[in-house]
Structure formats: structure tokens, C-alpha cells
Amino acid sequence: MKNIVLGMLLLFVAISTQAQEARGGAELSEVKKNKNAKYDIEVNGNCEQCQKRIQNAAYSVKGVKSAVWHMDDHMLHLIINEEKCSLLDVKKAVASVGHDTDEVTATDEIYEKLHGCCKYDRK
């Protein structure tokens, strides 16, 4: 009888240990999201109106901490909280106001509504 109880106790301890290891391994494999992730993306535009529109679109996404677009190199410099948004969220917001990015393009309908000086050469 002692052997049966001892064997069951050993089996219980072994199963408990394996379950804890499996749970701990899953936690380690999860990717920790950065609260201050920095990205630079190319956004088409021409003027100060474009700059204001692009930056406002980026800031409309919850989790964007900083958004600065430069006319000279057409780069949007971002700092985002990846726990609240993704880079794709920002690209979609920018495209929704008429400005193409590398991954998301504005619809023709929205692009045509841009002011004349804001229309850029589309790829």
C-alpha cells in the first residue's frame, strides 16, 4: 500500500513540474512590445499643408507619442507605444487623408480631394 501511495505522489509531482515548465516557457516566448518604438517611414507630400495633415493623421492613432514629417526627405519620424498601436495603424491613418506610404496607398477618391499644391507624383 505504501508503494502505491508513494508511486502516485511521485507521479503527481512529475506532472505538476512539467505543467509549470510548459507555462513558464510560453511566457518567455511572448514578444515584449516596446512602449517607445522608433520608426521612420516614407510618406508622399509636398507642402506645409501636407505636413500638418500627415502629422495630425498620425497623432489621431492612439499610442502615437511623436510624429514629425519633413518636406525635404518625405520621412515621417515616429515614436509609438506598440502596446496600443502598430506601425500599420499609423500608415492606414496617413493613407486615409490622401498620402501614400510604402505599404498603404490612399484611394484615388481621397487623393483627388487634396488641394492642388498637395498633389504629388504617385507611383
Language model segments and positions:
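Short, surface-exposed ligand-recognition loops at beta-strand->loop->(often short) alpha-helix junctions
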Residues: 41-50
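Sec-dependent signal peptide cleavage junction
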Residues: 17-42, 88, 104-123
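Helix N-cap motif at beta-to-alpha junctions
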Residues: 81-87
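Sec/Tat-exported extracytoplasmic proteins
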Residues: 62-65, 97-103
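Short acidic amphipathic segments
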Residues: 54-70
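Short amphipathic alpha-helices in soluble, non-transmembrane regions
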Residues: 54-56, 89-98
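Surface-exposed aromatic
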Residues: 71-79, 109-115
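Bacterial Sec-dependent N-terminal signal peptides
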Residues: 1-25
